[in-house]
């Protein structure tokens, strides 16, 4: 993935964190980022994540729920936002390979999450990916078997 898209994920994480903790309107958050004039990000992708995650929160939380070890509202807010971004990408952006989604989420968790938060994020999103990207998982496993 492009560095611009990685930066968009980082900005979306920050915006979604504000939205989750303070209930701030995503339009206001978007305006804040425009005013800050953050350069080098894929602004359209930032907006897609910033708006798409709240719009589909129920569906995303339902998708994540079976794999969480606690209710979603008890998950660390940073990891929660990362999990929701990852679930959104897995569900809504099938053109992005699941490995890219997982790697980007892990990097966000390493950078912004708790000490071992990246392991938690990886474990949850890996299970979500197996469920929602089953065909992609099977074809990857088949390719690995054929290579050995």
From Swiss-Prot:
Q: Which GO CC annotations does the UniProt entry carry?
A: cytosol
The record's annotation in Pfam families points to:
NusB
Record keywords, A-Z: RNA-binding, Transcription, Transcription antitermination, Transcription regulation
On the tree of life, the source organism's domain of life is Bacteria
Q: What one GO molecular function would you report for this record?
A: RNA binding
Single biological process term from Gene Ontology? DNA-templated transcription termination
Physiological role: Involved in transcription antitermination. Required for transcription of ribosomal RNA (rRNA) genes. Binds specifically to the boxA antiterminator sequence of the ribosomal RNA (rrn) operons.
Q: Which family does it belong to?
A: Belongs to the NusB family.
Quote the protein name from its UniProt record.
Answer: Transcription antitermination protein NusB
Could you tell me which species this protein originates from?
Nitrosococcus oceani (strain ATCC 19707 / BCRC 17464 / JCM 30415 / NCIMB 11848 / C-107)
